[in-house]
Amino acid sequence: MFKFFKDPKWFLWAYLGATIILSSLWIQVQIDVQINEWFGDFYDMIQEALAEPYAITIEEYWASLLSFITLAGMYVAVAVLVGYFTNHFLFRWRTAMVEWYHSVYDKARKIEGASQRVQEDTIKFSRIMESLGTSLIEALMILVEFMPILFGLSIGIPIFFFGEWEYGLVVGALLWSIGGTLFLVGLGLILRLVGVEYDLQKQEAAYRKMLVIAEDDETVRPKTLEELFNDVRQIHFLSYIRYLYFDIGRIAFLQANVLSAYVFLAPAIVAGVVTLGVMQQIIRAFGRVEGSMQYLLKAWPTIIELASVYKRLREFESKIDLLQIEESSLSFWEKYKKHWEKYKKQW
C-alpha cells in the first residue's frame, strides 16, 4: 500500500506533492485565523451600532463585509486548488498500488476476491484518504494555531467550573472532546464495528465470486446463490443494528456539543465582562479547537471503513508474499533437481 513512497519512480509526486498539500493546508488555516479576527471586529461594530444610532457609518459597514468577502474568496480559491491537486496526488498513489498488483497478478488471481481488492479496495482507499488524510492534517494545524488564540482570549474571563483560571477554556474543550471520543471509541470496540465491516465485505466478495462462476458454470444452482445471499443479508442486518446503537451515542453527543462553549462561558456572559465581538471570537476559536480534538469522533465511521479496507489489502498482500515465497522455494527445488540430475549423469 505504501510503495508509492518507496518507489523512486514516484518520489517526485510522493514527496513534492505531499509538501504542496501541507503548505496549502497551512495557508488555509492562516486565512481561517484572519476570519476569526474579523468576526471579533465585526460583532463589536454591530454591538456599537445597536447601542447608539449612527455610531458607525454605512461605508464602514460595507467595508467590513467586503473584507470578509475577500478573505472568504481567498479561502475558497485555496480549498478548491488543494482539493484538485489532492485528487491527482491520490490517484498517483492508487496507480503505484495497482501497478504492483498487476505485476504479480498471475499469482494474485488465485486469491479469493483478488479482482475486488485490486479494483474496488484501491479506489476506496484513495477516496477515503482524500477526505480523511487532509482533514486530519488540517485538524492538527488548527490546534497549533487556535489554541494560543483561545489561551489569549481566556485571560481574565470567569469560566464555568474553572473560575478565572487562564487555561480553563482549553482544558474544558480538551476534557469534553477526549471524554466524548473515548466514549465512542469504546462503544465502537464493544460493538466490534471494524470486524462487522470486514465480515460484510468478505461475504459480499464470496457472493460476487459465485455470481461470476454461475455465468459460465451451469452446475451452480440458484439454491447455492440463495444460501450465499442469505449470509449477506444476515451480516447487513447485524451491521444495521450495531450502527444504530453507535449512532445514538454519536449523534446525541454532537447535539450536546452545540451548547458546550456557551456552558463554559456562562459566568462571563451573565457578568457582562465580554463584548459581543470577543464572545464570538471565543466561541468560534473554542469550536475550532474542540472540532479538531473531536476529529476521531466525527470521522469515526470513515475511520472504521478505512481500517476495514486496510485490513483486507494487508491480508491480500500477505497472501501474495506467501505465494511468492512458495514459488521461490519451488524454483529453488527445481534448480536443485536439475543440478542433481546433471551431477548423476557426469558420474
Feature annotation, model-predicted:
Residues 8-31, 51-92, 162-187, 276-290:
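Transmembrane-helix motif of ABC transporter permease domains
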Residues 17-26, 133-195, 264-267, 271-274:
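Transmembrane helices of ABC transporter permease
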Residues 32, 36-40, 83, 98-102, ...:
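Alpha-helical transmembrane segments of polytopic integral membrane proteins
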